[in-house]
């Protein structure tokens, strides 16, 4: 009898201990921070200018992966953030970019536009309707039966909504015309604390007095990105034109504005205060001012990283005060791309040229008319993709596969074209690494019939967006950092897939990974 009682007591103590251990290992708050255009090489290059609270703390106390990889092409804000929080690629989540060509209407579609919902403090109608799979936010809301506090705060609309997913309780971004924090009726009522902030402390009350100049003595900025040395710099936002808020969102002050709202949020909600895990997704900006190149703003990009270092330190201190870093899991990563560099100076004689997709489409249509007779065989084009007229091809009883193959054979003869792929080859062709990344970048609802691969060093001229993009195969190094509850500090240079982020965070929170995430959680990350 005594033995049975003793056994029962031991079992009870063990189970209680395991439950306590499991509870302590589940963070009360998860903070996901995606920093637009953050580069691992710049983190290292400017390290002599950092303080102790930001990057240096992350490198000392966090688990740092210096070479994270996105498994698809044409990265931008929407596609990168969607990939982080769905744990998959555009092939499954449907988000191929900030905008794309709709195959049915032949019109440009923005990734978060939705006329069915009204904007709050904005005229933009917004929802995540184009996001085809579940996100980390969605799975947490399902797992907690809606009890979790799930919110998203970002300078831009796309990053806020893609991180918030379908089921979050709110997503907020800076209105590019008014500077107010905005939202959408899709996520329900607008929180009073955001409205109060807009009415009392909104950016529009302060922007005319803000001036961005060097944070450190100008002699500290020694990283050379231009042949013309800068003496100093000064940018203000006092003009009355509508683009002053757009420019502000490309300055380091945009990150401080995010922190200001995070402070209000943590003060006015119960996030991280109970045993139900909560999720706060944030975004910063680390690209060039006004999306210019490093050759124009060499000193600014260095100062931006110095200020980003301070802003990160402020965020870590804020979370520690309000929730406790021991109760919080933080993951930080990048969107994995940079604004296009200008073409190389001609005096260096690096092979280059210009590829005009509009001219390519016109020549292809003339060729197809010569082969198959009169008709508009090319419906439209976008970026490096060409959309064929399926209805005409069917009416003429032509073989679509043959038309695609002939088109590829013709296009690949053009100057600056390295290869051309039909959609059928991308989806059904023999596997190789290039085909795999193209397939991951493909979406049946919006991708073209032909994808044109342009030679590195050549500039793609886009008539739709009035832009010029120099093709570079080498993407900037993408950092991935985990910090906080149960994380084992270490610096690793082994490549890891960004698709593993969502399953890893889901594992920490003890919930399902998003429904299209097939990668395994990262191993060795726990203490």
Whereabouts are the PLM-identified features?
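Short, structured active-site-proximal loop/turn typified by the sulfatase FGly-forming signature C/S-X-P-X-R
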Residues: 43-92, 149-153
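Secreted, luminal/periplasmic, and some membrane-associated catalytic domains
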Residues: 76, 98-123, 133, 138, ...
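His/Asp/Glu-rich, glycine-adjacent segments
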Residues: 89, 97-276, 285-292, 413-415
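Substrate-binding rim/cap in mid-to-C-terminal beta-strand-loop elements of soluble/periplasmic
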Residues: 359-398, 467-509, 523-527
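A long, amphipathic alpha-helix that forms part
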Residues: 249-274, 287-328, 406
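Beta-strand elements within well-structured catalytic alpha/beta cores of enzymes
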Residues: 27-39, 58, 84, 140, ...
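Bacterial Sec-dependent N-terminal signal peptides
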Residues: 1-26
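Second-shell loop/turn segments in exported
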Residues: 39-45, 68-71, 121-128, 245-252, ...
């Amino acid at each position: 009898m005594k033995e049975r009682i003793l056994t029962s007591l031991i079992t009870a103590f063990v189970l209680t201990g395991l439950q306590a251990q499991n509870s302590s290992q589940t963070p009360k708050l998860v903070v996901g921070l995606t920093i637009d255009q953050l580069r691992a090489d710049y983190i290292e290059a400017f390290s002599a200018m950092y303080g102790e609270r930001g990057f240096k703390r992350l490198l000392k106390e966090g688990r740092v992966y210096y070479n994270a990889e996105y498994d698809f092409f044409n990265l931008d804000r929407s596609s990168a953030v969607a990939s982080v929080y769905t744990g998959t690629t555009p092939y499954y989540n449907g988000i191929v970019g900030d905008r794309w060509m709709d195959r049915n209407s032949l019109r440009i579609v923005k990734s978060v536009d939705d006329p069915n919902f009204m904007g709050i403090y904005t005229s933009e109608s917004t929802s995540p309707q184009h996001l085809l799979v579940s996100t980390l936010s969605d799975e947490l809301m399902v797992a907690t039966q809606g009890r979790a506090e799930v919110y998203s705060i970002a300078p831009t609309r796309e990053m806020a909504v893609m991180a918030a997913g379908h089921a979050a309780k709110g997503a907020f971004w800076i209105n590019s015309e008014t500077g107010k924090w905005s939202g959408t009726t899709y996520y329900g009522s607008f929180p009073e604390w955001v409205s109060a902030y807009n009415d009392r402390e909104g950016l529009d009350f302060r922007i005319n007095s803000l001036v961005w100049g060097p944070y450190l003595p100008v002699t500290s900025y020694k990283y050379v990105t231009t042949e013309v040395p800068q003496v100093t710099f000064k940018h203000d936002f006092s003009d009355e034109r509508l683009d002053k808020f757009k420019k502000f969102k490309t300055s380091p002050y945009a990150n401080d504005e995010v922190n200001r709202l995070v402070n209000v949020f943590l003060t006015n909600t119960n996030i991280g205060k109970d045993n139900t895990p909560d999720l706060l997704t944030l975004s910063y900006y680390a690209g060039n001012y006004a999306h210019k190149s490093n050759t124009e703003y060499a000193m600014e990009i260095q100062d931006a990283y110095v200020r980003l270092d301070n802003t990160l330190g402020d965020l870590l201190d804020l979370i520690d005060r309000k929730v406790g870093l021991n109760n919080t899991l933080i993951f930080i990563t990048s969107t994995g791309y940079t604004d296009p560099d200008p073409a190389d100076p001609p005096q260096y004689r690096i092979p280059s040229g210009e590829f005009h997709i509009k001219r390519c489409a016109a020549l292809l249509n003339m060729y197809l008319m010569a082969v198959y007779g009169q008709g508009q065989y090319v419906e439209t084009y976008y970026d490096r993709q060409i959309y064929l007229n399926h209805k005409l091809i069917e009416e003429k009883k032509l073989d679509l596969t043959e038309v695609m193959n002939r088109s590829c054979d013709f296009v690949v003869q053009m100057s600056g074209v390295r290869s051309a792929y039909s959609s059928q080859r991308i989806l059904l062709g023999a596997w190789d690494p290039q085909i795999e990344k193209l397939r991951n970048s493909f979406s049946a609802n919006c991708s073209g019939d032909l994808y044109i691969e342009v030679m590195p060093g050549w500039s793609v001229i886009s008539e739709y967006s009035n832009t010029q993009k120099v093709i570079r195969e080498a993407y900037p190094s993408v950092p991935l950092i985990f910090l906080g509850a149960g994380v084992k500090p270490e610096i690793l240079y082994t490549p890891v897939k960004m698709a593993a982020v969502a399953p890893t965070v889901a594992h920490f929170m003890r919930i399902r990974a998003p429904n299209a995430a097939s990668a395994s959680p990262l191993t060795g990350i726990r203490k």
